[in-house]
Structure formats: structure tokens, C-alpha cells
């Protein structure tokens, strides 16, 4: 295939990737302090690329769509007006179940740092 044919194929694949991405929005459970388990699901807006589950003290739970780059203790605590909490952010459909593993902010930061270091050394 000539360079023109390769360029056209790359262009078509790029358009297809964009169209496929536009057709799917993340789904998350969406409840605040449900009486039982949360079963209400919603489609997240285009700028919300994560689901979040929060357990706050005194007992209060949140299930929501969220922005992954805002998944940190300080932002969540300030935004939800909760001082003591555990949270889990995830990026798959309906992944914010109450039985999901809860990560503290420090654990999430450690995992991110290890991933960045591994990626850096592999390049």
C-alpha cells in the first residue's frame, strides 16, 4: 500500500475511533445514602470519566459519576463537605458498588506513583 493509501487508512481508523467513543458514556450507580443497596444507574456526562463510591463518617454513602482527575481526598472532602471518608474511584460501567474495595487517598497515590515509575523505566 502506498503512502497515500496508508494515510487514508489511518484517517478512517481515527474517525471510527472518535465515533465509537462518542457513542458510549460511562454508567455509574447514582444514590446518596440509600436505605439499601444502590440500584439506580445513570449515564455520566461527557466530562465525567469515573464512578465514585464514598463512605463518610457519620455513616453516609455516596454513589456518583465523577472526574477521574478529581479523585483525591482533599477535593472529594471539600466537594461533599465531609471531613472523614473513604473512597473508591473506578472507570468501568457500574463499578461503584458498595462492596467495592475502598482505597484511601494515600494508597491510591502510592499506586499511581508506582505505575508512573514503572512506565518511566520501561521506556
From Swiss-Prot:
Residues 26-103 form the UPAR/Ly6 domain. Residues 99-123 form a propeptide. CDD domains: TFP_LU_ECD_CD59. The keyword Nucleotide-binding does not apply. The keyword Methyltransferase does not apply. Glycans are attached at residue 43. Gene3D superfamilies: CD59. N- and O-glycosylated. It is a lipid-anchor; GPI-anchor. It is found in: Cell membrane; Secreted. InterPro entries: CD59 (IPR056949), CD59_antigen_CS (IPR018363), LY6_UPA_recep-like (IPR016054), Snake_toxin-like_sf (IPR045860). PROSITE patterns: LY6_UPAR. One of its GO terms (cellular component) is side of membrane. Expressed in all tissues tested (lung, testis liver, kidney, spleen, heart and skeletal muscle). Highest levels in lung and spleen, lowest levels in liver and skeletal muscle. A lipid is attached at residue 98 (GPI-anchor amidated serine). GO terms for molecular function: complement binding. Disulfide bonds join 28-51, 31-38, 44-65, 71-89, 90-95. Residues 1-25 form the signal peptide. Potent inhibitor of the complement membrane attack complex (MAC) action, which protects self-cells from damage during complement activation. Acts by binding to the beta-haipins of C8 (C8A and C8B) components of the assembling MAC, forming an intermolecular beta-sheet that prevents incorporation of the multiple copies of C9 required for complete formation of the osmolytic pore. Interacts with T-cell surface antigen CD2. This is CD59 glycoprotein. It comes from Sus scrofa. The lineage of its organism: Eukaryota, Metazoa, Chordata, Craniata, Vertebrata.
